[in-house]
Amino acid sequence: MPFVPHTEQEVREMLDAIGVERIEDLFDEIPESLRKASIDAIPAGMNEMEVTQLMRRRAAQDVQPACFVGAGAYDHHVPAAVWEITTRGEFYSAYTPYQAEASQGTLQLLYEFQTMMSELTGLYASNASLYDGATALAEAVLMAVRANRKVKSKRVLMPRSVHPYYRRVVETIVANQGIELVEAPLDDTVGRIDPEALGRFEDEPFAAVVIPQPNFFGALEEVDRLTDWAHGLNALVIAVCNPVALALLTPPGEWGTEGADIACGEGQPLGIPLSSGGPYFGYMTTRKQHVRQLPGRIVGRTVDADGRTGYTLTLQAREQHIRRSKATSNICTNQGLMVTAATVHLSLLGAEGLARVAAVSHERTRELVQKLTAIDGVERLFDGPFFHEVPVRIPAPAEEVLPMLANRGVLGGYDLSQEFPEWGPALLICATETRTSEEIDRFAAALADALRNTGQRARA
């Protein structure tokens, strides 16, 4: 519906009613210079057709650069059917389906999502989602402190290889709850937790140990060794995992001798497009004995009086709408619409399709690393296995190089010097199945040119 402003007659009547001659008189307390400075450049009003034409011209100026940025959000292909189904009227609501008899479709979909995530992580139960990966990790830390009955400590070992934004969010959420985060050291040669350096923590009690897989740098952690070490201290293990990577890697429930206790992470790679930081969704799964400490909604399957299968929200006594301040979490209405898309996405791909996405992403990243490290001065920051992200050192400041790449239609990675300045100029680069060999060649050529240009400026 077009916006129809007040008529001149209506404006006159309103001004007369308040005793003002002109609209400008309403703003006479603001100096005229300040008022005009911000509106002089605003063009005259347009009608609806003119605005439509202007927007089309503006849209035609947009370009879609080749994205080699990962760092927690990934440019995967999303089949057209995913959002065509997700935005149907039957699903197009994020609200919690309290009224089970009128919400069987939504409840079954959430149950299927939980089943898929349990299978993917190798753990018994899943919730129906959390807000995003960072808050999912924070909830996992809170849950682990509650659930660990063997250790009364409120200390959690948080490796430096966890996403720095995740660490900040967790610190913010647990700061006033008496929980202490202790940083685990990083092996700078391979970009992952150094198991040998953990010996100094063996006499210290921890409620939980966080293990990312793959970690922020794309490196694969020694999860079996780390899990057994943590359990040897009676600490719970929190796995932070990219769900796409789990299509190829050992699921957290099978890490070490006993498996991880909690798995969580960012669900964006499962059918959610990149969108200025969100909305995305977080996931969390856990062992059977910890289900009553799980935050968020849980959908269960049962049968009615006539023996028909039915779905309903279950174990609701954990939640804030019943327990209030004693609830496991204050999350209520969750990211249901994003979960709908993820469920459709996983259903369309299937287990083999998701594994193929993961495998091709790894292959594209290997090709990317090979092409970029052939450039003089570009080298891998770490040795060791990786999934689909790799840090590379470059011989020029990333803050100078990245704008040059953007001008060539390439989003050239994440500037690691923002969080890890001690490593010098470095980029965290990523390739998914959507990147082509031609785009990788274009990235390599653009990076080589950018480094030559920065080198010439430095010599001048």
UniProtKB/Swiss-Prot annotation:
It comes from the Bacteria. One of its GO terms (biological process) is nucleoside metabolic process. It catalyses: N(6)-[(R)-lipoyl]-L-lysyl-[glycine-cleavage complex H protein] + glycine + H(+) = N(6)-[(R)-S(8)-aminomethyldihydrolipoyl]-L-lysyl-[glycine-cleavage complex H protein] + CO2. It is an enzyme of class 1 (oxidoreductase). Disulfide bonds: none annotated. Signal peptide: none annotated. One of its GO terms (molecular function) is glycine dehydrogenase (decarboxylating) activity. The keyword Lipid biosynthesis does not apply. Pfam families: GDC-P. NCBIfam families: PRK00451.1. HAMAP family: GcvPA (MF_00712). Belongs to the GcvP family. N-terminal subunit subfamily. The glycine cleavage system catalyzes the degradation of glycine. The P protein binds the alpha-amino group of glycine through its pyridoxal phosphate cofactor; CO(2) is released and the remaining methylamine moiety is then transferred to the lipoamide cofactor of the H protein. The glycine cleavage system is composed of four proteins: P, T, L and H. In this organism, the P 'protein' is a heterodimer of two subunits. This is Probable glycine dehydrogenase (decarboxylating) subunit 1. The lineage of its organism: Bacteria, Pseudomonadati, Pseudomonadota, Gammaproteobacteria, Chromatiales.
